Amino acid sequence: MSFFGFGQSVEVEILLNDAESRKRAEHKTEDGKKEKYFLFYDGETVSGKVGLALKNPNKRLEHQGIKIEFIGQIELYYDRGNHHEFVSLVKDLARPGEITQSQAFDFEFTHVEKPYESYTGQNVKLRYFLRATISRRLNDVVKEMDIVVHTLSTYPELNSSIKMEVGIEDCLHIEFEYNKSKYHLKDVIVGKIYFLLVRIKIKHMEIDIIKRETTGTGPNVYHENVTIAKYEIMDGAPVRGESIPIRLFLAGYELTPTMRDINKKFSVRYYLNLVLIDEEERRYFKQQEVVLWRKGDIVRKSMSHQAAIASQRFEGTTSLGEVRTPSQLSDNNCRQ
């Protein structure tokens, strides 16, 4: 790796102690590509070595100290100059002096708190990384290594179904039902649509999974909606009394757990959007929020006791009632 200034005189490498056995997870980068990173959980220890290799053994490397940091950081893309750190740990590896030969320094961050899931979105990025720094008078030599953190949950104690009647007065009246209000990322959404009244010519019906990313606070709030999936549940005109089944597998889509008010910087919520299209290409829709969570039934053997406890947490939301009172889909709030 090349460095600014004195980068050509020394190479810095960060090695984890359990690199051979630790699982890797795919994570989307800022440019949309997927790469694999070492996977960690809340409460796990992060330990390893910082290796320094002199490119010219006959030259000495003077420095003002060597350190390694473990950092959890949120970056808002519209405010690139400011990085909001919610975890910042530092270990000094060497006092000011000279490096005369290649050597390695051990480090250990014990039971590190990693409260949030790694996330790369439309307007925000939450990342964890190790940063090794050789302080120099002019230019520091810096090496960073990103890791990925997953937040684990067990099955929520309360997980009521969602039932709702919606319609347009004297034109369309339907009842839809989803079997749960909270789904893990590999779950299956099971439900049904029942037509109580059909007086308009519906030709198509689908369910969309929508991710809504909210960043900022107060007047500087940005909302970004991304359609993750479109699932066709009907093609053709329904009749009164007809029931349409729903079975949507989540495992094939790029989803994250629901994230609410993360460090007071951003939120990520998911919605099921029921869309009906009539023969005149008018669109009617009804959105319903669902909670997504990462299943944590299998806990890594190498996880600490603290990490195992953390894996049992579930960040719930306001419970969704089993039955909703009928609501109307009007021209103003139901057509896209």
From Swiss-Prot:
Subcellular location: Cytoplasm; Membrane; Early endosome; Late endosome
InterPro entries the record matches: Arrestin-like_C, Vps26-related
Entry keyword Membrane: yes
GO cellular component: early endosome; late endosome; membrane
Pfam families, A to Z: Vps26
Keyword set, alphabetical order: Cytoplasm, Endosome, Membrane, Phosphoprotein, Protein transport, Transport
Membrane topology: Peripheral membrane protein
GO BP: any one term: intracellular protein transport
Function statement: Acts as a component of the retromer cargo-selective complex (CSC). The CSC is believed to be the core functional component of retromer or respective retromer complex variants acting to prevent missorting of selected transmembrane cargo proteins into the lysosomal degradation pathway. The recruitment of the CSC to the endosomal membrane involves RAB7A and SNX3. The SNX-BAR retromer mediates retrograde transport of cargo proteins from endosomes to the trans-Golgi network (TGN) and is involved in endosome-to-plasma membrane transport for cargo protein recycling.
Name this protein carries in UniProt: Vacuolar protein sorting-associated protein 26B
Organism: Pongo abelii (Sumatran orangutan)
